[in-house]
């Protein structure tokens, strides 16, 4: 026994995990998925105690390592027990519980020197396996193990292989559900199947997390940035239109080996989009397309030239297929230089549709400074002295320190110190008395009024206080401390908890992981770099309950910069393109795909940007202003936020998270209906024969049975027609066929799962999802349905209709799970045939198949803006 006894009381969801410990550990693995704030570390320590063996605990960072140590001391050790007797943070001095980072473990496994957060250790000549065996370590606990560098992961796999049997505990807030199958299998081989998942809605229901809401505040670029964006678009448009009429460019294309017949069909069809781009260009310039290439294209309709197709043409000309062109005058070198000079080429990639220049302007837009100031004023107006706001940034920007306090100094970068100065100016301008502070690993700035309290909290550390920039030393001071000092973060956090600091600005690296301040009731994510794991952890800082404050609610603010730019169409285009989807917006969209929260317009809990009622492109300034005004009003109504969570959580005693996939009604295969119509026609013929028979014989009593049979048959077929006419029914049958195919192929783990379809009339959409089964099952099913309905791109296998009804696609894609072998693809089709009718399997990697692929891609160009909408949603597990 390890002598660990939990001193608190377990919450219901924690108790459920521990009550099922015997079941979970039967295979030697306990794998728990738990949202930030769920007490995952505490459960992990209890599981280690129940195994009762010396344990090695691996964690991502030094901060989280110290959090584990602190939790053991405060929650599990009795008076008289010494932490140092039980716990070590050094692999060379192991104890019953040894807690180290993955980086230190990797260095020890490979006998390297380790340098991490100021801690240095030389593992040259150190035998890790022998040391662990000497300590009789029999339990391994992995905290967030899938977010590792590849070399660390390899060290972990090598250790498992060499060390022998171990009891394994895996804890994570963010399992890689959406990863490639190979990565998922690698993860499961290491950690075992997931035993239980604790979600954010469950934690809100249990009062472990507070009611909260996400807000996406749309920031407008500065006038200078907006002008740069406009100039870039105008310059691009002028250059592109000049290029299209350039005789040298036209000569280079029209004299290509492709048009002279010197490139074989096999080569042309290896990647058909470059051939398509040439033909589309010829069509746009009203030039003749060779008959053999038109036949190879497989379609009479050629789409309009747009930026996307011109980008493909230039990419092929310069980088992908330059051998197709005889460039005797080196025109392509001049073309490449011109494109680079205009920011339209980077790292051998032509970018006309998406621009890295524009992305960078918007991502780092100084308009976000105004956004942060606006949000601060909104929240202060709502909460006053109760405001506890955390602002997180990617960088400190130490070089700006000398400008702090100078209200006339221009701010040219985003970061901790620019955010602090922006908030200081805003508070000063509006006459607001608020305590601001900066907390990072190397820069700490505090209100002068808290100096004595900080000294009292850190009596063992020699602190110095000095002026910074032009800030009045009576208002703010910079804190100096030895680089080896411990406890600075904890002390400043305590001042924040007490309300002596109301707005804390810091770096995501310091405050994003492991740091805990339950008082935070407003979070501004001014960070634009980082994975979902990090943004999830940052968000987790704001949604914890605050003891003694049962009415706490929290607002999480995301910043996104948008500038409605009129994209000038290319010559000959019929409609204007919308290219407003920038990297900043895509980052926000990816974040929201993973965060379960309240929908603005419905009493539902789901993921996705749509739940925030975010405007749809093309964006207009009036639309953006109206949206920002709406979320300002929503953010102030915290009482309604709590009520809405309560009404949304009355789903059932037991919650289930499902992955919904939206399907357009006109894309659901309709061939079952054709089959029904065939029977309707047949029954009508029989009925007509019956009538003719009656007319000729005029002996009705002798043919009553035929009349009755015809009427019954007609009724049956009409009902069948009406039944299958429903897209709701057709989608459910299609989903069930796909579920059976996945089950038969071993891709689903639970044979008792079932397919359900919901119709959301307000959104004019049908959503299908898998009910029951593991979260991985749900994720895979949603992915497979989404791939089936996705526009044709470059899939390995397609399904092609023998004859498709008007308005229905003649092509569907075989999903990734079934495309590796022909047998798998055929099995997929066999399961679908009863519900979609006569489709045949097309292999797209030979000449005949590539022609069909090209044809299907050309025909699906009208659907180029189709997006497969997926989201997670809370449902009743009993429904």
Stretches found by the model and what they are:
Residues 26-47:
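Walker A/P-loop
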Residues 106, 409, 425-431, 438-607:
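Conserved RecA-like P-loop NTPase helicase motor core
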Residues 35-38, 81-99, 126, 136, ...:
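Conserved C-terminal RecA-like helicase domain
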Residues 104-105, 114-170:
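SF2 helicase catalytic motif II
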Residues 63-91, 188-191:
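Conserved helix-turn-beta segment of the N-terminal RecA-like "Helicase ATP-binding" lobe
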Residues 42-46, 50-76, 103-104, 152, ...:
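Conserved Walker A/P-loop ATP-binding site and its immediately adjacent core
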């Amino acid at each position: 026994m390890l002598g660990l006894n939990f001193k608190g009381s377990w919450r219901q969801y924690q108790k459920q995990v521990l009550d099922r410990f015997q079941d979970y550990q039967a295979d030697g693995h306990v794998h728990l998925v738990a949202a930030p704030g769920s007490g995952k570390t505490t459960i992990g320590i209890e599981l280690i105690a129940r195994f009762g063996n010396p344990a090695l605990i691996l964690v991502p960072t030094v901060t989280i390592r110290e959090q584990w140590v602190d939790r053991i001391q405060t929650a599990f050790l009795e008076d008289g027990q010494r932490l140092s007797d039980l716990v070590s943070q050094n692999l060379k001095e192991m104890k019953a519980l040894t807690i180290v980072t993955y980086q230190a473990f990797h260095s020890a496994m490979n006998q390297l020197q380790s340098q991490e957060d100021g801690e240095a250790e030389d593992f040259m000549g150190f035998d890790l396996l022998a040391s662990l065996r000497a300590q009789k370590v029999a339990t391994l606990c992995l905290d967030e193990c899938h977010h590792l560098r590849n070399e660390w992961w390899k060290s972990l796999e090598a250790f498992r292989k060499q060390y022998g049997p171990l009891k394994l505990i895996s804890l994570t807030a963010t399992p890689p559900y959406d990863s490639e199958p190979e990565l998922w299998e690698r993860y499961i081989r290491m950690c075992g199947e997931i035993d239980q998942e604790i979600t954010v809605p469950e934690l809100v229901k249990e009062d472990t997390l507070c009611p909260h809401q996400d807000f996406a505040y749309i920031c407008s670029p500065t006038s200078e940035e907006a002008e740069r964006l406009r100039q870039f678009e105008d310059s691009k448009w002028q250059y592109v239109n000049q290029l299209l009429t350039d005789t040298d460019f036209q000569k280079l294309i029209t004299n290509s080996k492709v048009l002279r017949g010197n490139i074989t069909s096999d080569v042309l069809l290896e990647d058909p989009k470059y051939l398509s781009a040439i033909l589309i260009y010829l069509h746009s310039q009203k030039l003749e397309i060779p008959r053999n290439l038109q036949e190879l294209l497989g379609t009479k309709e050629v789409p309009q030239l747009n930026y996307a197709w011109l980008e493909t043409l230039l990419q092929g000309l310069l980088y992908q297929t330059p051998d197709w062109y005889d460039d005797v005058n080196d025109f392509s070198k001049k073309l490449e230089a011109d494109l680079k000079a205009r920011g339209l080429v980077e790292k051998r990639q032509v970018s006309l549709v998406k621009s890295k220049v524009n992305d960078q302007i918007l991502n780092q837009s100084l308009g976000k400074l105004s956004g942060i100031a606006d949000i601060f004023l909104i929240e202060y107006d709502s909460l006053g002295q109760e405001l506890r706001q955390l602002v997180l940034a990617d960088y400190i920007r130490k070089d700006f320190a000398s400008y702090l306090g100078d209200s006339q100094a221009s701010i040219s970068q985003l970061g901790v110190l620019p955010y602090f100065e922006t908030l200081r100016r805003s508070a000063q301008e509006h006459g607001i008395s608020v305590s601001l502070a900066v907390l990072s690993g190397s820069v700490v700035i505090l209100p002068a009024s808290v100096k004595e309290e900080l000294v009292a909290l850190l009596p063992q550390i020699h602190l110095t206080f000095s002026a910074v920039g032009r800030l009045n030393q009576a208002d703010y001071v910079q804190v100096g401390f030895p680089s080896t000092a411990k406890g600075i973060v904890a002390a400043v956090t305590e001042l924040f908890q007490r309300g002596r600091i109301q707005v804390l600005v810091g770096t995501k690296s310091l405050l994003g992981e492991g740091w805990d301040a339950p008082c935070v009731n407003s979070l501004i994510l001014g960070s634009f770099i980082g994975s979902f794991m990090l943004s999830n952890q940052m968000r987790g800082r704001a949604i914890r309950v605050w003891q003694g404050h049962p009415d706490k609610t929290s607002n999480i603010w995301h910043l996104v910069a948008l500038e409605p730019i009129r994209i000038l169409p290319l010559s000959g285009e019929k409609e204007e393109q919308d290219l407003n989807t920038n990297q900043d917006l895509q980052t926000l969209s990816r974040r929201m795909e993973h965060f379960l929260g309240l929908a603005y317009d419905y009493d539902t809990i789901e993921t996705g940007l749509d739940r925030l009622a975010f405007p749809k492109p093309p964006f207009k300034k009036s639309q953006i202003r109206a949206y920002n005004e709406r979320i300002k009003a929503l953010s102030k109504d915290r009482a309604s936020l709590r009520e809405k969570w309560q009404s949304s959580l009355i789903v059932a005693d037991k919650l289930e998270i499902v992955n919904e996939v939206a399907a357009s009604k006109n894309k659901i295969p309709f061939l079952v209906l054709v089959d029904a119509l065939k029977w309707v026609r047949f029954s009508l013929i029989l009925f007509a024969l019956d009538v003719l028979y009656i007319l000729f014989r005029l002996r009705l009593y002798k043919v009553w049975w035929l009349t009755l049979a015809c009427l019954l048959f007609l009724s049956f077929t009409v009902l069948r027609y009406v039944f299958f006419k429903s897209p709701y029914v057709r989608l459910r049958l299609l989903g069930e066929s796909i579920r059976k195919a996945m089950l038969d192929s071993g891709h689903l783990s639970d044979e008792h799962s079932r397919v359900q379809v919901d119709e959301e009339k307000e959104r004019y959409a049908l959503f299908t999802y898998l009910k029951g089964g593991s979260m991985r099952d749900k994720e895979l099913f949603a992915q497979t349905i989404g791939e089936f309905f996705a526009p044709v791109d470059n899939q390995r296998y397609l399904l092609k209709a023998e004859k498709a009804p008007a308005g229905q696609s003649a092509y569907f894609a075989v999903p990734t799970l079934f495309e590796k072998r022909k047998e798998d693809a055929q099995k997929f089709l066999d399961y679908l045939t009863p519900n979609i009718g006569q489709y045949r399997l097309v292999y797209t990697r030979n000449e005949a198949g590539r022609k069909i692929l090209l044809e299907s891609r050309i025909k699906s160009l009208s659907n180029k803006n189709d997006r497969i909408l997926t989201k997670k949603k809370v449902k009743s597990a009993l429904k």
